Amino acid sequence: MSIDGILERAVNGERLSMEDAVKLYESDEVEKMGAAANQIMLKWHPEPITTFVIGRNVNYTNFCDTYCRFCAFYRAPGHKEGYVLDDEVILKKIQETIDVGGTEILMQGGTNPDLTIDYYTDLLRNIKERFPNIWMHSFSPAEVWKIAEVSSMSVEEVLRELHEAGLDSMPGGGAEILTEETRLRVSRLKITWEQWINAMKATKKVGMHGTATMVIGFGESFEERALHLQRVRDAQDETECFTAFISWLFQPENTGMYKTKKLTPRDYLKNVAISRLFLDNIPNFQSSWVTMGPEVGKLSLQYGCNDFGSTMIEENVVSAAGTTHKVNTNKILQLIREAGKIPAQRTTSYEIIRTFEDKEAAEKDFVMQN
């Protein structure tokens, strides 16, 4: 069945249904979807600019009592290989990030049952006292629900205290697939899809924004993928809590799901395009070169992405599953230019800091650590 009618409706600004999304997932006309998604991206972003942010992942703890089957990073509470980083180690990592022009810290960890709200607020105040201008784009719904549980607080109360202590925005990690079927199969102890949605809505209530994410490749159905997109779109309609959408593929190596069939870059590009076509209320789509590699990341700029994501001075979670791609600032500039775009460094809230003209390079750069 031709998908031309669905694509035409999307490009003309008509909202797609879940049934439309399923038909797109069933089709192999990926290039057509990419072209339509690119047209929609250009309506949001008519200038030939692709943005990126200079940031670092800081994984402050790997202790986690959620035991997701797909995670190679966590260690059970009490495990000899588990850790909680000292504040001074975290502060040193932030200083190194600022030294190369970084503006964002994506600080995330496991759901550590030994860390109460006081640990997080003390850490954030310590960071902001030393580095008042760094943007803390940190934690996740699962971590916030764990803090609420061990601190006998509501999620909204936790987010309000974190925000007052220095949290600026919250990434939408841990969404994976927002359906009960897949979550029960791959992360039985993790927060429910409703809890994830409610935490992201609560970020807006306390004066912050967040991002929405999606991970495919757990063996979920096309209907589940469409339902995930529907739930994200509904939450955005209600609260406008998301500044961006990021999707990637599950990396099965070194995990409890290592026998799962690995999806292809083509599957990733199709998902990016369908998401852009469906999510008509989210302005920014980030490439996921960290999992997909820089060349596929570059291709995604033709499939609906307007942003290359973060430089990732450090990354530990994806690399624990056997996937390591190292890209510094000047490599990102090169990749964006190869895609026919003008690179521009941005803040976490998508304000442009600097546009790199012609062959202009970053004066300060780094070697990715992990």
Swiss-Prot record:
EC number: 1.21.98.1
Gene3D superfamilies (alphabetical): Aldolase class I
Occurrences of domain Radical SAM core (ranges): 50-295
InterPro entries (UniProt xref): Aldolase_TIM, CofH/MnqC-like_C, Cyclic_DHFL_synthase_mqnC, Elp3/MiaA/NifB-like_rSAM, F420, FO_synthase_su2, rSAM
A GO molecular function held by the record: iron ion binding
Classification via CDD domains: Radical_SAM
Catalytic reactions of this protein: dehypoxanthine futalosine + S-adenosyl-L-methionine = cyclic dehypoxanthinylfutalosinate + 5'-deoxyadenosine + L-methionine + H(+)
Record keywords, A-Z: 4Fe-4S, Iron, Iron-sulfur, Menaquinone biosynthesis, Metal-binding, Oxidoreductase, S-adenosyl-L-methionine
Keyword Acetylation on entry: no
Record-linked Pfam families: CofH_C, Radical_SAM
Protein residues bound to [4Fe-4S] cluster: C64, C68, C71
Named cofactor requirement(s): [4Fe-4S] cluster
Stretches that traverse the bilayer: none
The keyword Iron-sulfur is annotated on this UniProt entry: yes
PANTHER family the record matches: FO SYNTHASE (COFH), LIPOYL SYNTHASE 2
Its job: Radical SAM enzyme that catalyzes the cyclization of dehypoxanthine futalosine (DHFL) into cyclic dehypoxanthine futalosine (CDHFL), a step in the biosynthesis of menaquinone (MK, vitamin K2).
Stated family: Belongs to the radical SAM superfamily. MqnC family.
HAMAP family per the UniProt record, alphabetical: MqnC
Protein name (record): Cyclic dehypoxanthine futalosine synthase
Organism: Halalkalibacterium halodurans (strain ATCC BAA-125 / DSM 18197 / FERM 7344 / JCM 9153 / C-125) (Bacillus halodurans)
Gene name, Swiss-Prot/TrEMBL: mqnC
